[in-house]
Amino acid sequence: MAVRPGLWPALLGIVLAAWLRGSGAQQSATVANPVPGANPDLLPHFLVEPEDVYIVKNKPVLLVCKAVPATQIFFKCNGEWVRQVDHVIERSTDGSSGLPTMEVRINVSRQQVEKVFGLEEYWCQCVAWSSSGTTKSQKAYIRIAYLRKNFEQEPLAKEVSLEQGIVLPCRPPEGIPPAEVEWLRNEDLVDPSLDPNVYITREHSLVVRQARLADTANYTCVAKNIVARRRSASAAVIVYVDGSWSPWSKWSACGLDCTHWRSRECSDPAPRNGGEECQGTDLDTRNCTSDLCVHTASGPEDVALYVGLIAVAVCLVLLLLVLILVYCRKKEGLDSDVADSSILTSGFQPVSIKPSKADNPHLLTIQPDLSTTTTTYQGSLCPRQDGPSPKFQLTNGHLLSPLGGGRHTLHHSSPTSEAEEFVSRLSTQNYFRSLPRGTSNMTYGTFNFLGGRLMIPNTGISLLIPPDAIPRGKIYEIYLTLHKPEDVRLPLAGCQTLLSPIVSCGPPGVLLTRPVILAMDHCGEPSPDSWSLRLKKQSCEGSWEDVLHLGEEAPSHLYYCQLEASACYVFTEQLGRFALVGEALSVAAAKRLKLLLFAPVACTSLEYNIRVYCLHDTHDALKEVVQLEKQLGGQLIQEPRVLHFKDSYHNLRLSIHDVPSSLWKSKLLVSYQEIPFYHIWNGTQRYLHCTFTLERVSPSTSDLACKLWVWQVEGDGQSFSINFNITKDTRFAELLALESEAGVPALVGPSAFKIPFLIRQKIISSLDPPCRRGADWRTLAQKLHLDSHLSFFASKPSPTAMILNLWEARHFPNGNLSQLAAAVAGLGQPDAGLFTVSEAEC
């Protein structure tokens, strides 16, 4: 049977559609030419064609085609037909021409694009059919968007003179689409259209044509595309001005001494920002011409004046000599105390007196003398034992235990003990007068090479100064401060959140030969797949810098952070201001919130307020709320609960239920209260809480029973069953008693450490050298579960010392020395004598 020629394209489209619908197979297609004799005006014409698009993260992209007239439209991607079931089709009729119109949409996923290997890019195009033939659309390329983290070139700090040109190079990270670059000056955007003195080159370098004093700032290169925004390290640019002399003044009148003078100042311009001072003198003196000089004989008044001036000068010189002598005497006394370290490292045990050096009679060891004075010193480096055995074995766990009293005696033959003076110098002093005076949030002390420890009670914040971290011969006053978030401006970008308190230790710039360990709590739920954690440090200019990206540590880094479930331990040789900041990588990232319910201890009115606090699950946040509630006269009415708050952008809701209407009436006008997501996630707002006000029907009502729910929308939640007597129920008051941390806020020398000094030294000397059988510091780290970053320990002169320091920071003051002794003894060292300490060594 003959078929009319005009029906062939339609039949071909129907057959092709039936084949795709039935088999779902993908095959190459041959596009037909227009049918001979057909009207070319009726070929499909595309109203919408697919365009190039980028896949961001894991979100699929949508491609759209629309053609008229069209009886069929199919997508072809990388030469293969897309299955019909993956097409979303809409048919309509063009209003003006009455021709059939078709619109087709498909989704392309990241997995489909990633299946294409090699140099070929993933592309898709549409093929439309009509009764007159077929038409192809343009190709649309689908690319996966990304932006690397590391800049190929970052700007470097510069010091330039006034009116000199400045070029700050910046090569952004590799990315698709290519990153756009902008520059920040002290966090303000640099706009070349507003400042003709600056421009940005095609290579993204920032150029300042002529440096001005106002150009002194921190410059940051920012790269961004549709995926992310990256910041380079800030580069400090200092524009300095060298000083120049002003013109000489006129000569002064001729004086009685037949001289006159003229002066000038280093003010044309004055040196700025570290510029060089003017060279030469600012005063010029010359003899006067003889006829201008007036000669007069010195009278009795002048002689008396000269004698008085000479007497004053002599007195000042004598006073200066006395002060120098007193200073040298004190310094000599302190050096004699510190120079013979056996007095300190032997635990102040008595040995025979003899001069230690022929040329220095001040260096003496100590001999027992029952007739002399005795000075007590808190702590010891070596435990004493009154039994007949002269040796201690480390393999017995109790040998690492401290003495009950922890006190040892130092015998000295002088009436005024040098040790007493030395210990008094190492005690805490009221020294840092310029620091915040909040006594509960600050501690400070004086330390030398023996080390020590600073603690802010009931906050989980401490600073461990290991032995030999301070150079011998140096004495530092060191402080430790907890800051309120509103007092310190910590900029948080994007989804970043503060996970720890903001803590300062200082003074900055002191020389340390070993890393100190800063311990502080955090409220993040550690998960490498959910969090990007960064340690931030404030620079001397006031800006915050990322000094460590957890999980990307390198042995050469100056910092290391041991992250645990609720605390972090920061190794640093540079003191300063630190904070732990997290950036959520997925909605699974969660912060721990502690929920606390408070109510008045005494209620004299009919109204009764229940305050629900939602705070970071850290000791310092708990301490602040407890102190606040003590001032308000509040009491805890339920045991605290922990809620996991996720980065889902959903708010926190609180509601109260099952209030007995015959006894109480709720004054809440809505069914629930909310705390906005960003108020919690930001982490810088304190005392976040909601108040539920209940009213007693009768003044005699004292029993309260209800339920209180706290939950994140589409997330975790907690419920409290409240059932207590508001006048006499205090069973939860004991939960408010803050744990008293052992010792004082500042511990100096041996009393700051659990491990006796000589035993510590023997462990270090035994485990530092590599051992073929594995009985070295690596095995000790594994036994103590400190093997997450062995390369950091290996980069230090004594890896064992780093491990023991971290153990001290984690376990003070309640560490189990028996477990440590068992771990060391279980290494199987062949020479047990390495862990033996004799009375002579003590």
Curated annotation (Swiss-Prot):
Residues with attached carbohydrate: 107, 218, 245, 248, 251, 287
Membrane topology field: Single-pass type I membrane protein
TM region(s), chain numbering: 307-327
SUPFAM superfamilies (UniProt xref): DEATH domain, Immunoglobulin, TSP-1 type 1 repeat
Gene Ontology terms: cellular component: membrane raft; neuron projection membrane; neuronal cell body membrane; plasma membrane
Domain Death: 761-841
Subcellular location: Cell membrane; Membrane raft; Cell projection, Neuron projection
Miscellaneous field: Down-regulated in multiple cancers including colorectal, breast, ovary, uterus, stomach, lung, or kidney cancers.
Protein name, entry field: Netrin receptor UNC5A
Organism of derivation: Homo sapiens (Human)
Taxonomic classification: Eukaryota, Metazoa, Chordata, Craniata, Vertebrata
Gene: UNC5A
